[in-house]
Structure formats: C-alpha cells, structure tokens
A protein has these predicted regions:
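Interhelical loop/hinge segments that connect adjacent transmembrane helices in multipass membrane
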Residues: 1, 5, 140, 183-228, ...
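Signature of the first transmembrane helix
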Residues: 3-58, 81, 85-99, 114-119, ...
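Helix-loop junctions and terminal segments of transmembrane helices
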Residues: 53-72, 134-135, 193, 245, ...
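Hydrophobic alpha-helical transmembrane segments
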Residues: 110-117, 145-191, 204, 208, ...
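Membrane-proximal transmembrane or re-entrant/amphipathic helices at the cytosolic face
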Residues: 395-399, 403-405, 412, 424-483
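N-terminal membrane topogenesis motif
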Residues: 1-24, 57, 62-65, 69-80, ...
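Transmembrane helical elements of multi-pass membrane transporters/channels
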Residues: 8-23, 170-173, 177, 181, ...
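Membrane-interface junctions at transmembrane-helix termini in multi-pass inner-membrane proteins
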Residues: 2-6, 63-72, 122-146, 163, ...
Length: 483
C-alpha cells in the first residue's frame, strides 16, 4: 500500500467519523424538536428521492474516476450528461409528488419532495467536480467539503426546526447542504476543469453509465427483497426482528467498510492508469479488510444476545439468533467486497452487471426456499448466495487480471488464522464473563478487548499486512510526537 492510499484512507475515516459526530448531535436535537410524524413524512420522501438519486448520477462519477484518458471533450460530455439526467430525474420527482402524496394520504409529501427536487438542479454542477477530486485522490479537500457541508446541514435543520418549519426543516437542510457543497467544489475543484457542457464523447459516458446504473438498481432490489418475502411469509413482526439484526451488522459497513470503498475505486483506477500491480493491491486490500471484519463479525455472532439486550432491551432477544446467523453468513462477502470497485475502476462495469444478473436470481431462489422452513433458516441461507457471488467475482477477476485465485485470496488465509485467534480469545473472555455474571457492558468490553488483543498478537505472530501497517502508523506517530 503506497503513501497516497494511506493518506486517502486516513482522511476518509476522519471525514466519516467527524460527520458521524455532527449527525448524532443534530439527530438528538431534531428528535426533541420534531414529532415522530414529522420525521416520518420526511423519511418517506427521502427514501423516494434516494431511489431517484441512483438514476440521477447514472454512473457518471465512476466514469470520470476510471477513464484512462480524460480529455476535455469527455469532461464536457460528463457535465452535459449530469445536467440532462439530473434535471430530468428532478422533473420526474416533481411530477410524481402529487400521486405519491395521494397514495400515502399525506399532503406534506408534496412540499417535501418539491424542496428536495432542488437538489437535482444543483447536483449536476457539483458531482463531476467531486468525482474529479476522487480521481486525483484529494481526500483532504473532500474532508473539508464533506465536514463543512455536514455542519451546514445540521445547523440549518436545527435552526429551522426551532423556528417552526416542521418536516420542511429537514428538506431545506438537505438543499443547504447540497448548495454549500457546490460552492466549495467550485472553489476547490482541480484546475482547468470548469468547462461548458458538450455532446462529443457522450456515447462513452452513457455506455458506461447504462451498465453501472442497471447493476446498481438490481443490487438495490436484491438487497431489500428479503423484507417483502419475510413480510409475506412470517409477518411484520419478523420483518422488525430481521431488520434489527441486520441493522446491527450494517454498522460495520457504515463506519468502516464504506470509508475504505470510497478510496478503493480511485486507488484501483490510479494503479490501472499507471500500469501498476492490481492483483497485489486487491490481495493486500482484501487481506486487510478480512483481518478487521472477521473478528468483528465473530464478536457479534458470539455476543449477539448481550449486544441486543444492552442496546435495545429484552424485547429484542428473538433477534439474537438471527443476528448470529447473519454475522456468520456475511463473512465470505469480505473476500470480494473490493470486487465491484475493481471492475468499476478498470471500466469493466458490464462484468459487474453479468455477475448481478446471475447472483440476484440465485439469491431470491435461495431465500424463497429457506422461507419455507423458518426465519433462522432464511438468515443462514445467505451464506449460499454469498459463496455464489464469491465464485463469480473470483472467476471474472482471474480472467481480467490474469491472476490465480491463490494470488488474489492467498494473503487472506492469514486473516482466517488471525480471526481464529481473535475469536478464540473472545470466546474465552465471554465464557468467563458469563460465569462471573458480570454486567452486560463490562462483559462486552472485556470480550471485545480480548478480541482486539488476540487480533494484534496473531497478526504480529503471522506477520500479517495489517500488523505491518499498524507498526508503520505507530512509528510515524512516535516520530511526529518526538521533539
């Protein structure tokens, strides 16, 4: 891992957690200023707009990041495509707001979507510049932009809510966030990138984008299909239990994985343009991800009941076995979590679409079969789908990179041993905590601490890449702290 990637990861994690602190503070304030009904109105509208946002970007940001030879004509075409699609999707959102309000029997939906649609008018001027900062791996600038706009979002929402704007305060906060972000991007964009839109090169932009957005839509549907199946077969209470269990596991994605994936695409694209060793970068990145993810999911699998009871109360105990099974089933995904980014970064979005066209039907069939037995069977069945996805990604990456499966996944064998050491330490600590009948929080802290200690000892003993990176970071910090 080179210094550019390390720096990008530091700034990406810094932005993620700085914004998280701001969001938690604003959420706590808004929860006291707005009623559940007001927040509910905004949430429904935000969900609708989120789906539209997938269409709005149309893969143009990824196109700009991965394009090997980004000429002025291609950049002009990207601006033109962003404006054409963004404004069209915004217009469709405006036209759909009245039927949606009637379907939901909530007139406030008209106002909220009308305000949120302004984002679609602004974003086409911001998203290409943001993509270019990613392309050049300017994550320090991205940190400034994202954190500053998060502050504007939080302050706007709270101030408007205090002045009686109700659910509109959240909508206007979103627009303020987008507008401020666009202004910062105008000032901090890479030099020579503020160009008039053009149509030359539009075919390449839309060719890449059509594959990308189709793949994203299939992934979005597949990722949420289980809720409809569970609701139909087991009822809404089971949907709540399953969602609570899955939501706990998604905390890792939100706070760790997403920060890595934001850096992965530009890092792979940069290596691809320079003719670098992509198999080695993928193998090292995957080894690092699995060494962190597997001990975490092992911790959740072991301690799911205690975690659920501490965070949500005894009424959610039934979600604990579901959480355990999902945690185990998710583990194989971290062997290919960087796969979609690698395919995007090298321009092979068609291969990503082919994978989804195979994986999605398999996943749905597996869920439907498992739903004939129990909710726990459905949760455990996810491992079948994930192993199918793993085999597909390895197959396509082998042919694309000219590398063997051992080259791509070999370093992750050490991660399995690191995870085994960490989970063994956790299991021992958990058993001792339960025998001593320690309070839940103390038991979880001891078990988590034992897991971290086991991870560090095993990683150092096995000379895992994670240990090398941690030692490098430690020496760097000590050097900076020394006068």
């Amino acid at each position: 891992m080179n210094g550019k990637v390390r720096g990008a990861l530091v700034w990406s994690f810094a932005e993620r957690y700085a914004s998280l602190i701001v969001n938690i503070a604003s959420t706590m304030a808004l929860a006291r200023l707005l009623t559940p009904a007001q927040i509910g109105v905004y949430s429904v509208c935000a969900a609708f707009v989120t789906v539209a946002t997938v269409l709005r970007d149309f893969g143009i940001s990824e196109y700009l990041i991965q394009e090997k030879e980004l000429t002025d004509d291609k950049l002009r075409a990207a601006y033109a495509g962003a404006i054409a699609i963004g404004w069209s999707v915004g217009l469709l959102a405006l036209l759909a707001r009245h039927p949606l309000a009637q379907a939901l029997r909530e007139p406030g939906v008209v106002n909220v979507i009308g305000i949120l649609a302004l984002n679609f008018a602004i974003l086409p001027f911001a998203s290409p510049a943001f993509a270019l900062l990613n392309r050049h791996m300017e994550f320090r600038k991205i940190f400034i932009i994202q954190f500053s706009s998060s502050m504007v979002h939080a302050c706007t929402g709270v101030l408007l809510a205090m002045n009686g704007f109700g659910f509109r305060s959240l909508a206007w906060a979103s627009v303020a966030n987008t507008g401020f972000q666009a202004l910062l991007l105008l000032a901090m964009r890479p030099p020579g990138t503020l160009l008039l839109p053009g149509v030359k090169g539009m075919k390449q932009v839309f060719g890449y984008g059509s594959y990308f957005v189709t793949s994203r839509l299939i992934e979005t549907f597949t990722r949420n299909a289980h809720e409809f199946i569970i609701a139909r077969v087991f009822g809404l209470t089971s949907v709540g239990l399953f969602s609570r269990a899955l939501g706990l596991l998604e905390m890792f994605y939100t706070n760790v994985t997403s920060a890595v994936l934001r850096v992965a695409t530009p890092a792979f694209a940069d290596q691809h343009r320079q003719g670098g060793d992509l198999p080695a970068l993928y193998a090292q990145g995957t080894a690092m991800m699995t060494a962190i993810a597997w001990p975490f999911f092992g911790f959740v699998a072991l301690m799911s009941r205690d975690i659920m009871r501490l965070l949500f109360g005894a009424q959610w105990d039934a979600a604990a076995p579901i959480c355990t099974l999902l945690a185990l089933a998710i583990m194989p995904t971290y062997l290919y979590s960087l796969g979609p980014n690698l395919l995007n970064a090298t321009g092979h979005v068609a291969k990503r679409l082919r994978i989804n066209l195979i994986y999605s039907p398999v996943h749905l069939i597996v869920l439907l079969i498992a739903s004939r037995f129990s909710l726990e069977a459905l949760a455990g069945s996810w491992i079948v789908s994930h192993l199918v996805a793993l085999s597909l990604y390895v197959h396509y990456m082998r042919s694309l990179l000219g590398a063997t499966a051992r080259t791509l996944l070999g370093p992750s064998l050490k991660s399995a041993m690191v995870a085994a050491g960490s989970i063994a330490a956790q299991a021992l600590a958990a058993e001792l905590s339960h025998r001593a009948q320690l309070p839940l929080l103390i038991g979880l802290m001891l078990t988590g601490g034992a897991g971290i200690a086991g991870l560090l000892i095993a990683a150092q003993a096995l000379r895992h890449p994670l240990a090398q990176e941690l030692m490098r970071a430690f020496h760097h910090l000590r050097k900076r702290a020394t006068p």
